[in-house]
């Protein structure tokens, strides 16, 4: 059964109350630079940073299906910030600076690598469909897939040679990104296992800041397939994709388990 978890509501004004004048300036949104399916990116007062805002909109099948998941932006912001902090403590460099309020997070400005990294631990989704195999088979080793980020082309699958030849990243950067991805996978698999969740697969994005490769974007039920270990109930955006219902409750269940584990 999915447990209802009520997030504490934090407004921008209440969040700003504890900040210095300089820190409050960092929280001021300037020009909207980019709007995607689930987030908006704003310029910040300090040009070294962006402000990333999470939305409640949900999309699937390249935007063909659209809807709203109640408080999704709030929940995903919280989950992603908690997981990024945990990864930072484990030695993974990320774009996270600080969570500003319930929907907004301050991140480092960086040049994004236009390649999505998908890591799979269990057969599901397009992997099962393309290869004609059943869902739910535990893989003997993780599978890494690369996709060129291009909405018009529907994010085609590529390999390291495509990325290097097209100049999206050099060979060394791609290899480092893959190595970081595998390390993140090991950390997250153990963490989710401890809270009774199977990390089926997930998507990562990276960028380059001051010559360093940083983990960017988010890690949330929007970008991961998460199944309850006992019931195999889906706790991610597949509930929206497949019209299963209970999306908000599933997302709340994930953040509840994460917070309880990290508060020990």
Task: Mark where each language-model region is.
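Short, Lys/Arg-enriched N-terminal segments with co-localized hydrophobic residues
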Residues: 6, 19-26
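A short glycine-rich, hydrophobically flanked beta-strand micro-motif that places a catalytic Asp/Glu
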Residues: 98-103, 193-207
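Conserved metal-phosphate-binding beta-hairpin within the catalytic cores
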Residues: 119, 199-217
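C-terminal helix-cap and adjacent tail motif
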Residues: 137, 219-264
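Active-site loop/lid in soluble adenylation, ligation, and acyl-transfer enzymes
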Residues: 28-147, 258, 262
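Classical Sec-dependent N-terminal signal peptides that target proteins to the secretory pathway
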Residues: 7-17
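A long amphipathic alpha-helix within ATP-dependent nucleotide-binding catalytic cores
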Residues: 168-200
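Short histidine-centered catalytic/ligand-binding loop motif
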Residues: 64-74, 157-180
């Amino acid at each position: 059964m999915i447990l209802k978890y009520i997030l504490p509501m934090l407004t921008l004004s209440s969040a700003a109350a504890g900040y210095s004048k300089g820190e409050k300036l960092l929280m001021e949104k300037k020009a909207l630079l980019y709007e995607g399916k689930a987030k908006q990116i704003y310029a910040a007062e300090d040009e070294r940073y962006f402000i990333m805002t999470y939305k409640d909109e949900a999309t699937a099948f390249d935007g063909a299906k659209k809807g709203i998941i109640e408080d999704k932006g709030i929940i995903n912001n919280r989950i992603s910030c908690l997981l990024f902090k945990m990864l930072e403590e484990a030695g993974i460099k990320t774009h996270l600076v600080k969570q500003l309020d319930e929907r907004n997070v301050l991140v480092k400005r960086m040049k994004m690598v236009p390649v999505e990294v998908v890591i799979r631990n269990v057969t599901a989704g397009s992997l099962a469909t393309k290869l004609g195999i059943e869902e739910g088979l535990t893989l003997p080793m993780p599978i890494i897939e690369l996709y060129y980020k291009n909405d018009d082309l529907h994010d085609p699958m590529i390999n390291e040679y495509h990325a290097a030849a097209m100049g999206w990243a050099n060979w060394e950067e791609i290899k480092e990104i893959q190595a970081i991805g595998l390390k993140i996978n090991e950390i997250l698999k153990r963490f989710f296992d401890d809270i009774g969740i199977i990390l089926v697969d997930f998507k990562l994005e990276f960028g380059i800041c001051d010559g360093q490769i940083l983990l960017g974007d988010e890690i949330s039920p929007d970008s991961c397939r998460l199944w309850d270990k006992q019931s195999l109930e889906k706790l991610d955006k597949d509930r929206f994709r497949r019209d299963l219902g209970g999306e908000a409750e599933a997302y709340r269940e994930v953040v509840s388990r994460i917070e309880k584990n990290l508060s020990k």
